[in-house]
A protein has these predicted regions:
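Periplasmic c-type cytochrome electron-transfer domains
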Residues: 1-289
Length: 289
C-alpha cells in the first residue's frame, strides 16, 4: 500500500466537510476505539440527525472480505465509501459536489500531490486506509501462537463456540466472507428491512444479512444488523435455544443450538478473548491532528 494514499484516505475518512450539513464523517459512525463500529445509537445517524435502518458495522480485516454492507450491495472495497457519501440519510453529497470541494481545497490539493484529484483516486485512498485495519493481536491469537494458555473457562467456551457458532463465524476471521444468513430475528415492522433480498430481488434472500466478524465483538455493541441487542450476554442467550435454517452456502438444513446458563457464561468468556487492545488503541487509526 502507498503510505501517501493511506494518509490521504485517513484525512478523507475523518472529514465532516464531505457531508451536506458539515457534521458527519465516516469516522463519526465508525469509531476506531470500538473497532470502527457505532455504539452511540442502535442505528446510525446521518446528516440532519436522520436515522438509518441499520447499525454501522465494525471495520476490520477488510482485505479478506468479498462483499460489503449488511446486504452485500457493494462488491469491491474501492467502491464502498461512495454509498454512504451519496446516501440521503448518511452524508447526502453528490459526486459533483465532492469533486468540486476537493479540487478547491488547498489541503486536498497538497494531499493529492501529483495524483489527479478525482473520485476514483479519492475512493481508492479511503480503501487503502481501511485496508490497514488489521486485527490480529487478541488473546485468542496469542493462544493460537502458543504464547498464552486459555483459562479452563475460556477453553470450555472455545469448544462450545466451535460446536455451536463456528459454522457461521469460522476461524480465523470469525465470519464467513460472502455468506448471508438468517438468525431468526423477526423483522422490525417500522424498518421493513428485507436484507439481501433488497439487492438480489430473490424471495429466498429475504431477511438474510451478511455474517459479521466477531473479532473485537466485546467493543462493537449494540448487536445485530439493527442494533436491537445491547450486550453479549443477551445475544448468547438469544442463540442458546435456537434452531437456525442454514443457507445453501453453509450446506442448508437445520442447525440446532442448545446452551445452558453456565455454558452461556463460558461462551461469553471466550468471546472476550477476541478483543485486540492494540487494534482498538492504534493511534494511526485515529483522527489526524
Amino acid at each position: 500500500m502507498d503510505p501517501e494514499m493511506v494518509a490521504l484516505g485517513r484525512k478523507l475518512f475523518y472529514d465532516v466537510r464531505l457531508s451536506s450539513d458539515g457534521r458527519v464523517s465516516c469516522g463519526g459512525c465508525h469509531s476506531s476505539y470500538t473497532a470502527f463500529a457505532h455504539v452511540d445509537h442502535p442505528r446510525s445517524h446521518g446528516v440532519l440527525d436522520r436515522e438509518g435502518r441499520r447499525n454501522a458495522p465494525a471495520l476490520m480485516n477488510l482485505a479478506w472480505q468479498s462483499e460489503f454492507m449488511w446486504d452485500g450491495a457493494i462488491k469491491h472495497l474501492d467502491l464502498q465509501s461512495l454509498a454512504p457519501l451519496t446516501h440521503r440519510t448518511e452524508m447526502n453529497m453528490s459526486i459533483d459536489s465532492i469533486l468540486l470541494f476537493l479540487k478547491n481545497d488547498p489541503g486536498y490539493q497538497r494531499a493529492f500531490g501529483k495524483r489527479e484529484i478525482s473520485i476514483p483516486n479519492m475512493l481508492k485512498a479511503v480503501a487503502q486506509f481501511e485496508m490497514t485495519f488489521i486485527s490480529r493481536g487478541s488473546r485468542y491469537d496469542s493462544m493460537k501462537r502458543k504464547q498464552v494458555v486459555f483459562t479452563d473457562q475460556e477453553h470450555r467456551g472455545y469448544q462450545l463456540f466451535q460446536k455451536n457458532c463456528g459454522i457461521c463465524h469460522s476461524e480465523p476471521l470469525f465470519s464467513k466472507p460472502g455468506t448471508f444468513a438468517s438468525n431468526g430475528l423477526l423483522m422490525d415492522s417500522l424498518l421493513h428491512d428485507k436484507g439481501r433480498a433488497e439487492i438480489s430481488g430473490k424471495p429466498e434472500d429475504e431477511f438474510l444479512f451478511k455474517v459479521p466478524s466477531l473479532r473485537n465483538v466485546e467493543a462493537t455493541y449494540p448487536y445485530m444488523h439493527d442494533g436491537r441487542m445491547k450486550t453479549l450476554t443477551e445475544v448468547v442467550k438469544y442463540y442458546s435455544d435456537r434452531t437456525l435454517l442454514l443457507p445453501k452456502a453453509l450446506g442448508g438444513g437445520q442447525h440446532i443450538i442448545v446452551l445452558n446458563s453456565k455454558e452461556r457464561v463460558d461462551v461469553v468468556a471466550f468471546l472476550m478473548t477476541l478483543t485486540d487492545p492494540r487494534f482498538l488503541q492504534n493511534p494511526s487509526f485515529q483522527e489526524p491532528r
